[in-house]
């Protein structure tokens, strides 16, 4: 077992609703925020950040909110994030925000510019009809284009990401061109993860042969060092090189009372212990691959997702009942 060091701690409060219902939502958004009241969360975060920066020098500590950036008092929220030293005080993921017309989009972007936002990111699931179905909201595609146009006018740079599957791969070339024309600084292709509702996309996970539908330009936007076929990963000597750990503290209505009575470091140590218990319950990747791997498998994965896929199969076969540290709606961890 490799030595794991906690290198970052993120505190989150999932108290802000998302206006989409995306098919692969990492946070399995179901219309009901799990976080605690905003002000209560900020007070606790301020104490935790102060304690953790003193106790864990050299460990990066940050604060964020979700499910979307559609905070009812977004300007004040951004000022709070800046005061707490959060990276999201300069970068926003602009998915799942409320419907706005062109004028309202301009007002939003002008406010973001004034508050020091330097970069935005948009996730686009396909061309208009497909995107709207995938996002679970009619008009979402057009909203993203309005927001991109307003960001461009306000002088805020933005990037775009396209999660590609068997369903939308043949739309990708056209979509890449549209996003670049809209002013996207970069366009990245990625394979959806297996976590949250991502596991429901397994039947349409991209395979190596599907890449022939992409132009050379679009194909170059998918990092094939990160995304490889199962066969390619299994041919690597030791593909899982996990030495770093991020601890996630999620302030929720079902834990905030307890967290308020405890020191930040005691909560972090509790989650670190849960992380160790979770990962020690499984054989290593090589053993899991012997049991569940397909040496000829052509589906594309990040190694993290393939590892997660094997662990899920092992847990089901052995009826494991573990605290799921990979569920990002609750306090947990992520290794890399």
Where do the language-model regions lie?
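N-terminal pre-triad scaffold of radical SAM enzymes
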Residues: 1-28, 49, 53-64, 248-253
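Core AdoMet radical
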Residues: 9, 29-41, 53-71, 84-103, ...
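Radical SAM enzyme [4Fe-4S]-AdoMet core and its adjacent flexible, acidic
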Residues: 28, 34-36, 125, 133, ...
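Aromatic/hydrophobic pocket-lining residues that form the small-molecule binding cavity
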Residues: 41-45, 74, 105, 144, ...
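Short, acidic/polar
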Residues: 45, 101-111, 170-176
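Acidic (Asp/Glu)-rich catalytic clusters
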Residues: 48-54, 78-85, 107-117, 149-153, ...
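Active-site-adjacent beta->alpha loops and helix N-cap segments on the catalytic face
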Residues: 71-77
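Accessory C-terminal segments flanking Radical SAM cores
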Residues: 223-324, 336
């Amino acid at each position: 077992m490799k030595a794991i060091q906690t290198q970052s701690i993120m505190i989150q409060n999932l108290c802000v609703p998302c206006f989409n219902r995306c098919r692969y939502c990492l946070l399995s958004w179901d219309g009901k925020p799990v976080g605690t009241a905003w002000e209560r969360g900020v007070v606790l975060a301020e104490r935790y950040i102060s304690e953790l920066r003193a106790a864990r020098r050299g460990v990066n500590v940050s604060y964020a909110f979700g499910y979307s950036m559609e905070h009812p008092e977004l300007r004040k929220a951004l000022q709070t994030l800046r005061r707490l030293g959060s990276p999201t005080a300069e970068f926003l993921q602009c998915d799942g925000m409320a419907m706005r017309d062109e004028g309202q989009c301009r007002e939003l972007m002008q406010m973001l510019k004034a508050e020091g936002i330097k970069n935005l990111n948009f996730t686009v699931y396909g061309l208009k009809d497909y995107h709207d179905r995938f996002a679970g909201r009619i008009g979402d595609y057009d909203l993203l284009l309005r927001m991109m146009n307003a960001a461009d006018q306000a002088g805020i740079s933005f990037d775009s990401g396209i999660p590609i599957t068997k369903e939308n791969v043949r739309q990708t070339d056209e979509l890449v061109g549209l996003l670049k024309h809209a002013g996207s600084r970069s366009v990245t292709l990625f394979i959806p993860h297996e976590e949250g509702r991502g596991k429901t996309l397994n039947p349409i996970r991209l395979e190596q042969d599907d890449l022939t539908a992409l132009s050379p330009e679009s194909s170059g936007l998918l990092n094939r060092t990160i995304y490889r076929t199962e066969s390619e990963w299994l041919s690597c000597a030791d593909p899982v090189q996990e030495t770093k750990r991020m601890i996630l503290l999620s302030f929720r209505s079902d834990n905030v009372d307890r967290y308020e009575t405890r020191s930040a470091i005691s909560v972090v140590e509790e989650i670190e212990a849960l992380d160790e218990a979770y990962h020690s319950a499984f054989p290593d990747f090589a053993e899991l691959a012997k049991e569940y791997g397909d040496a000829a498998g052509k589906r594309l994965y990040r190694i993290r997702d393939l590892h997660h896929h094997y662990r899920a199969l092992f847990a089901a076969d052995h009826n494991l009942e573990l605290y799921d540290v990979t569920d990002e709606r609750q306090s947990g961890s992520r290794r890399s």
